[in-house]
Amino acid sequence: MHVVTHLSEKYESLRNSENGWSIQEAGMAQLDDIVGSVMKYLKENGLDDNTMVVFTTDNGAENFTWPDGGQTPFAGGKGTGLEGGFRVPAIVRWPGKVPAGKVENGIVSGLDWFPTIVAAAGNPDIVSELLAGKKVGDQTFKVHLDGYNQLDLITGKAQSARHEIFYLTETTLAAVRIDDYKYRFTDQPGGWLGATEKVDWPILTNLRLDPYERTGMFNGKDNGSIAYYNWFAYEFWRFVFVQKEVAKAAQTMIEFPPMQGGASFNMSAVKAAIDKAIAERAMGK
């Protein structure tokens, strides 16, 4: 669901004083029926046993537009570098391939779906082929995919191929996660609509011990711990790992520079574009 949500009359009518449903419950009922119609089509056309169905979403709850945007138990929400902005549900159905009822807690990114689905279709080497340059028709594609083939993970044959994930908020590297540890470089006390602050000391979190990111320096008002500083000091050596991961990712941008700049929702990016256009015009370009 996404702001502004307009339910069809059938589902809007489900909201009444007796059940106390909000737009969320009625919207989920409509979404459930939409998914059901897709599954029904696959079954009626004999495709359901040989089709991989992935149900997921592109970002965490947009809780600043509540109630449309919903809520999340995780800290933050859409547009932030906190878990609430990135953690999403993912359900995979592929009869005879994906074990029914199996729960996986390994790290998976939305970037992984393309190489995974291509592998399921018969080509497990798409990532390396694109790195070398793959010709399709009259065009050659030479690109760096940041996704991993997770086919062995979803079929129950192996653990996740991914150990790291980069949290990008617009064009800012807000955090990096490596296995259980998350290293956060920014803070957004006002959420997506507020300012982004660069912290002097990266905020270190063990997401297995603190999945809701409640623990930090004790300041008398937030969920902090008087023992956090001591724990942080003993774990500080881990920053060598994040330095290596960021350096490795940065190295790929030399051979494969970004095709376009990231989107920005603040006026500084607009001003920079205007200033560039004015300068180019003055030079006669």
Cite the ranges covered by each PLM segment.
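Catalytic cores of eukaryotic secretory-pathway lumenal/extracellular enzymes that build
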Residues: 13, 17, 79, 87-91, ...
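Active-site His/acidic residue clusters
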Residues: 1-24, 62-64, 68-72
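Beta-strand elements within well-structured catalytic alpha/beta cores of enzymes
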Residues: 1, 28-31, 35, 52-57, ...
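Non-transmembrane alpha-helical segments in soluble domains
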Residues: 25, 32-39, 43, 114-122, ...
